[in-house]
Amino acid sequence: MLFRSGTFSIALTHRYQFEGGTVADPTNWDGGQVEISTNNGASWDLIGGAVYDGAINGASGNPLQGEQAFVGTSTGYPATMVDTINLGTAYANQTVRLRFSVGTDSAAGAAGWELHSLALTGAGTPFATLAPQNTSCSPTAPLVFTDGFE
C-alpha cells in the first residue's frame, strides 16, 4: 500500500475471545496483534499501543509472550467493536504491509479473533492504473469429471 503525506490510521471492526483474561482466569495466555512492515515483509514492527488490552503472560510458551496484544474477551462479545490505530505521519510516502498475528500457548484455547472489516485512512490508491480484462471464460469448454462425479 502506498501512503500519501498526512496521517495514517487503521480502523478494525473485530471481535475476539482469547484464553484467559477473565475473573476466573486473569492470566492472559493468548492474544492477537497488528504489525507493520516497510521492507516488503523482511521484518515486522508491532503497532497498536493504546488499543491493546494487556500483555501476554511471560511464562506461557506463547511466541508473543510479554508483548502487548488484544487479550481476554472484547467488549460486548459476541458483538463486534471498532478499534482505531492512529499512526500519524510515521509512514507517510512509504509502501507498507500489514500483518495480523495470533499467538497462543499449547494449552486449551478459546474462540479466537475475527476481523470483520478494515478501513484505512490516509492510504494512497493501491493500484496506479486498472488493466482491462483481455480474455473471457469459455462456456462451451468441455467439462472434466473425476472419481465418478458427474
Regions found by a protein language model. Name each.
Residues 1-150:
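Beta-sandwich/jellyroll recognition modules and their flexible linkers
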